[in-house]
């Protein structure tokens, strides 16, 4: 059960969804500039996750008292991407109240990100501190975008197409696994050795 939930946060699923979200953001009230802004914020979150993974895998850096090794990538991506998926799919053509990010679709996306984090803990993939860190980083990406740019809206004529495209990508990508972790474990020792970094 928990593995099935955890798969919703795999990069093989969330990154294709993010690409579709960016495409629809360019056609929404947000526009291309704001779509690029969300993409950069997501990339920054991913870079932070990647940095902790490389430091741990290659250099052994960790915070032992709180059992923290790396930021959970599944949880971070899920908490950043699923809120945008839900907002675009469920809020199309609906005028937000004073551009407030406090909406049911946004809450559903954040809750799903938290659930995926819980699944990672039960799967023994991460500790609670790693999942909390992932949720905070991912949620910060989602909420910061909404606070700064408001809730994006797609023309009501495209609402079914938005939901359909996101559903199709989800169905095609679900259950697949990106080889990112394997690449990190392979190259991190080389990078740490190259820069002579010692834990």
Where do the language-model regions lie?
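Internal/C-terminal transmembrane anchor helices
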Residues: 157-175
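Hydrophobic alpha-helical transmembrane segments in multi-pass integral membrane proteins
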Residues: 149, 171-182
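Hydrophobic alpha-helical bundle signature of multipass membrane enzymes
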Residues: 1-70, 75-118, 143, 151, ...
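Short, aromatic-rich membrane-interface segments at the entry and exit
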Residues: 32-36, 127-131, 156-157, 181
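Short, strongly hydrophobic alpha-helical membrane anchors
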Residues: 1-5, 193-199
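Membrane-embedded alpha-helical modules
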Residues: 138, 145-156
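Interfacial helix-loop-helix junctions of multi-pass membrane proteins
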Residues: 53-70, 114-142, 180-195
């Amino acid at each position: 059960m928990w593995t099935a939930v955890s798969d919703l946060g795999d990069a093989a699923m969330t990154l294709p969804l993010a690409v579709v979200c960016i495409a629809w953001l360019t056609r929404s009230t947000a526009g291309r500039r704001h779509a690029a802004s969300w993409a950069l914020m997501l990339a920054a979150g991913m870079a932070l996750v990647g940095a902790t993974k490389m430091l741990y895998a290659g250099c052994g850096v960790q915070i032992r008292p709180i059992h923290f090794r790396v930021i959970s990538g599944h949880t971070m991506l899920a908490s950043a991407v699923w809120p945008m998926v839900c907002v675009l799919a469920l809020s199309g053509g609906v005028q937000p109240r004073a551009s407030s990010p406090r909406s049911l679709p946004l809450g559903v996306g954040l809750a799903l990100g938290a659930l995926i984090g819980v699944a990672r803990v039960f799967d023994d993939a991460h500790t609670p501190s790693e999942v909390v860190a992932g949720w905070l980083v991912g949620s910060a990406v989602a909420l910061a975008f909404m606070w700064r740019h408001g809730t994006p809206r797609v023309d009501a004529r495209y609402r079914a197409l938005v939901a359909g495209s996101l559903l199709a990508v989800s169905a095609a990508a679900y259950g697949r696994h990106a080889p990112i972790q394997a690449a990190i474990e392979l190259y991190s020792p080389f990078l740490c050795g190259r820069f002579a970094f010692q834990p």
